[in-house]
Amino acid sequence: MRRLSGVLLACAVFLIPAFSHGHGDLFAQQAPQKTTFTGDVAVMAYAINPDKTADYEKVIAQLKDALSKSEAPEAKQQLAGWKVIKNATPNPDGSIVYIHIISPVVKEADYSIMNNIYNAVKDPAEQKAVFDMYRGAMKQALFVIQGPMVADLSK
């Protein structure tokens, strides 16, 4: 009996803090996850819903605007090395592939599309609208490749 009461007391000690805050507080305390790269070059590919390519391109335009207005010194470097191309032909399922090519990678810079937009767009309703547009356009992330430059044939 003494052992059971000890176990119950221990559980109560751990559970009370978990229930003492609202869910909003728990989510608000979590910092958004950064997307960083360690290689010299990064390539990311996303399949976009065919009827939402204009929405995706609006999000990319907002990303460019956010980085260009940012006071962070690495933002200008990110702009200089971040290119986005659109595949000319659709995938068999109709989705359109967008490839992000980042060269050179700015070490420790955040390459999260939404984090960078949120740094510029402070209104929660507008943030939600941009996120919904981004999420609605995205069929799936295909891959991320990063690594060192092995050969630069232009030199």
Where are the language model's segments positioned?
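Positively charged n-region of N-terminal signal peptides that target proteins for export
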Residues: 1-4
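Bacterial N-terminal signal peptides
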Residues: 8-25
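Sec-dependent signal peptide cleavage junction
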Residues: 21-32, 152
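Short, glycine- and small/hydrophobic-rich beta-strand elements in well-ordered beta-sheets
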Residues: 27-39, 68-98
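Acidic/histidine-rich, surface-exposed loop or edge segments in extracytoplasmic proteins
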Residues: 37-50
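Extracytoplasmic/secreted envelope proteins and their assembly/folding machinery
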Residues: 41, 53, 57-60, 64, ...
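A mature extracytoplasmic/lumenal domain signature
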Residues: 48-50, 60-62, 88, 100-106
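An amphipathic, aromatic/His-enriched active-site/gating alpha helix that lines ligand/cofactor pockets
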Residues: 64-80, 94-95, 101-155
